């Protein structure tokens, strides 16, 4: 859709959880990077599934089973269209981004990485996009290499080209950093990887909720994301993989539905995408994810981008009026809707606890990015993040709470 704005007040009404008060204050939920809230439209389709056609898929010919199968496979088609994948078989439903990346590391990685090969990542990665590759490198006696970052936590083309070479077999990179808000040029990185015969696996957990994705344009070999960060249910994720790669990969989980034929001593596997979806799949969650995608598409990514950009820049400017507050990452005009910060000498957990008393929900800790924390020279940070239901009032509430927090911790008892 081409709309450049939406009625945020109307959007807020779609999220029942935002109606409540926290500590007798209006709730300012600024933790969507960890988990977004869920609109009533998604809640309704989940309720409808369990009330009207709760059944297993693929196996039954009865009416409820057919309805459930249609809902599940229609959800797959919705995801395919959403990211412009070429084939429906390229969409694998998983438990989330972490599970998706692990499938790639274990199935593709174990079969294609040998001693002396190189796997390229960055220090800005979530643990879900470091640990699987770290373990793969250990299993195969391969080398894990890191693309250097600038002081603002961005990647430069020369450094990317200098790190990826003919020994590189896999490049694993976040489209958007969950800490810094850095937006990586994954299309260019994919092109460089392919020039050296490597594949690229993109962690899209922080991009899928916020920007239009086109797998034909990006040319990623694998792309992973989660439903719960994009207005959908928890427990559902997506692994996109190019069909020719997935066809040659072995399944990593075994059981019902993913088989073609089972004898006493051997088995053969079902075709894509089923061979990667062992057991009863995430039926309700997939249907809920599809509805979340419809909701996002109705708002339009242009409008979502403009809304988040305005909020992020406003928050960036207002937060920097507080003495002793340091923001990490790129400048305000080159970041996604994430602001990670520290306030004077106050521990981030104390900051998060203090602002919570004022109804403000932010995240504190290492954000599953300990190598990045070490790179920043800190043990932890606080983080505010913005989505479609946030307003300048939320930002003002955060800034006021931070000022009160600083004043409280500066008081000499």
From Swiss-Prot:
InterPro entries: Aminotrans_V_dom (IPR000192), Cys_dSase_SufS (IPR010970), Cysteine_dSase (IPR016454), PyrdxlP-dep_Trfase (IPR015424), PyrdxlP-dep_Trfase_major (IPR015421), PyrdxlP-dep_Trfase_small (IPR015422). SUPFAM superfamilies: PLP-dependent transferases (SSF53383). The modification N6-(pyridoxal phosphate)lysine is found at residue 229. The keyword Transferase applies. It comes from the Bacteria. The keyword Amino-acid biosynthesis does not apply. The active site is at 368 (cysteine persulfide intermediate). Keywords: Pyridoxal phosphate, Transferase. Its EC number is 2.8.1.7. GO terms for molecular function: cysteine desulfurase activity; pyridoxal phosphate binding. One of its GO terms (biological process) is cysteine metabolic process. It catalyses: (sulfur carrier)-H + L-cysteine = (sulfur carrier)-SH + L-alanine. Its cofactor is pyridoxal 5'-phosphate. Belongs to the class-V pyridoxal-phosphate-dependent aminotransferase family. Csd subfamily. Catalyzes the removal of elemental sulfur and selenium atoms from L-cysteine, L-cystine, L-selenocysteine, and L-selenocystine to produce L-alanine. This is Probable cysteine desulfurase. It comes from Staphylococcus epidermidis (strain ATCC 12228 / FDA PCI 1200).
């Amino acid at each position: 859709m081409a709309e450049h704005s939406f009625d945020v007040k109307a959007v807020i009404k779609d999220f029942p959880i935002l109606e409540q008060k926290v500590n007798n204050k209006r709730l300012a939920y600024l933790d969507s990077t960890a988990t977004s809230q869920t609109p009533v439209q998604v809640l309704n389709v989940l309720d409808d599934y369990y009330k009207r056609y709760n059944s297993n898929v693929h196996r039954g010919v009865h009416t409820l089973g057919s309805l459930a199968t249609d809902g599940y496979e229609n959800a797959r088609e919705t995801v395919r269209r959403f990211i412009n994948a070429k084939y429906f078989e390229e969409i694998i439903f998983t438990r989330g981004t972490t599970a998706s990346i692990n499938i790639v590391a274990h199935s593709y990685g174990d079969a294609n990485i040998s001693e002396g090969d190189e796997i390229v990542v960055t220090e800005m990665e979530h643990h879900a996009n470091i640990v699987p590759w770290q373990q793969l490198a250990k299993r195969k006696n391969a080398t894990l290499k890191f693309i250097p970052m600038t002081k603002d936590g961005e990647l430069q083309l020369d450094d990317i080209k200098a790190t990826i070479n003919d020994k590189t077999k896999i490049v694993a990179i976040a489209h958007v950093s969950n800490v810094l808000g850095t937006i990586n040029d994954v299309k260019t990185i994919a092109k460089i990887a392919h020039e050296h015969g490597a594949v690229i696996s993109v962690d899209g957990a922080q991009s899928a909720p916020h920007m239009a994705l086109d797998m034909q344009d990006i040319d990623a070999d694998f792309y992973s994301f989660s439903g719960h960060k994009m207005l959908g249910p928890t427990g559902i994720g997506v692994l996109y993989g190019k069909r020719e790669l997935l066809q040659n990969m072995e399944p990593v989980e075994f059981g019902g539905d993913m088989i073609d034929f089972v004898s006493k001593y051997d088995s053969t596997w079902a075709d894509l995408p089923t061979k990667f979806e062992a057991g009863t799949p995430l039926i309700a969650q997939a249907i809920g994810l599809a509805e979340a995608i419809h909701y996002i598409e109705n708002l339009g990514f242009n409008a979502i981008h403009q809304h988040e950009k305005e909020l992020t820049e406003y928050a960036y400017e207002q937060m920097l009026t507080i003495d002793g507050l340091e923001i990490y990452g790129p400048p305000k005009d080159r970041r996604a809707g994430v602001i990670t910060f520290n306030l004077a000498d106050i521990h981030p957990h104390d900051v998060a606890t203090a602002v919570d008393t004022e109804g403000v929900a932010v995240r504190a800790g290492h954000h599953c990015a300990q190598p990045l924390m070490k790179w920043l020279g800190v043990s932890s940070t606080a983080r505010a993040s913005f989505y479609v239901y946030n307003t300048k009032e939320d930002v003002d509430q955060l800034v006021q709470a931070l000022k009160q927090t600083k004043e409280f911790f500066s008081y000499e008892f």
